């Protein structure tokens, strides 16, 4: 997927809280992901996984706390402090995000979707980069087809390709295998493994054990917006991800 080496960047959550009215979606979230680490989030629906990922992506502003992106040498890279109510938190520009609900434009072709975002992100050599990704996600032969004609799995491939356009140093994924067939899951696992091995920092939410979950070297379980487990022990990581919804 990529021949580049990343400048490893971590993610630090400092006492992050998120409230929606009287509902606390996240409470006292404090942990750090090391540059180049691959971390899986587990927990029931509504436990706070998606909210945490959206905060990391800069799409949701926390009610309190601070989000920073330390580099491998310890300097803060792209700090994202809590902003005013009118100013959203800014995510690190090199982060890629894949949402649980595929965020693609139905009335555009697969190629048009990627070219649009490549130009918005000022991707170098956008046409060549888009063609390369379409080949790698197995959609080059369908590049001129409207996305509304695609299956859910094919739409997810477009969304994943979009997140990889600028070869991000941080990749955030919310249940990325949703709608993918076994071949698609195998492709995604191979892609994430290559990115991880190149130094990309990965934070992803997962439901159950799969080929993708085996990539995680750390698992964090959320329950009612709180971190209730955080381990790098191989056996415990597997246990948490095997019973991710328990």
Segments from the language model and where they lie:
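Conserved ABC ATPase "signature" region
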Residues: 115, 119, 125-142
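H-loop/switch region of ABC-family ATPase nucleotide-binding domains
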Residues: 206-207
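The feature captures the beta-strand-to-loop junction immediately N-terminal to the Walker
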Residues: 42-44
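Catalytic Walker B motif of ABC-type/P-loop ATPase nucleotide-binding domains
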Residues: 171-174
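Helix-to-loop junction immediately C-terminal to a conserved catalytic motif
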Residues: 57
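Conserved catalytic motifs of ABC-family nucleotide-binding domains
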Residues: 167
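Hydrophobic anchor residue at the start of the ABC signature
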Residues: 160
């Amino acid at each position: 997927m990529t021949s580049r080496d990343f400048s490893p960047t971590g993610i630090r959550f400092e006492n992050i809280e998120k409230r929606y009215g009287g509902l606390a979606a996240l409470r006292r979230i404090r942990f750090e992901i090391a540059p180049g680490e691959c971390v899986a989030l587990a927990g029931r629906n509504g436990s706070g996984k998606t909210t945490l990922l959206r905060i990391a992506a800069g799409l949701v502003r926390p009610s309190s706390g601070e989000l920073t992106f330390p580099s491998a040498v310890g300097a803060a890279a792209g700090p994202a402090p809590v902003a005013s109510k009118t100013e959203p938190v800014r995510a690190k520009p090199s982060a890629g995000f894949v949402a649980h609900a595929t965020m693609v434009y139905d009335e555009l072709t697969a190629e048009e979707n990627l070219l649009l975002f490549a130009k918005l992100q000022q991707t170098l050599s956008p046409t060549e980069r888009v063609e390369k990704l379409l080949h790698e996600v197995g959609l080059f032969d369908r590049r001129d087809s409207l996305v509304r004609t695609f299956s859910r799995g094919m739409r997810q491939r477009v969304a994943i390709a979009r997140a990889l356009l600028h070869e991000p140093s941080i990749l955030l994924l919310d249940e990325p295998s949703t709608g993918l067939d076994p071949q698609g899951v195998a492709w995604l696992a191979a892609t994430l493994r290559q990115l991880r091995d190149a130094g990309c920092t990965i934070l992803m939410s997962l439901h159950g054990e799969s080929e993708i979950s085996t990539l995680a070297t750390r698992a964090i379980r959320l329950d009612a917006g709180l971190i209730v487990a955080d381990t790098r022990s191989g056996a415990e990581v597997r246990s948490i991800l095997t019973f991710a919804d328990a």
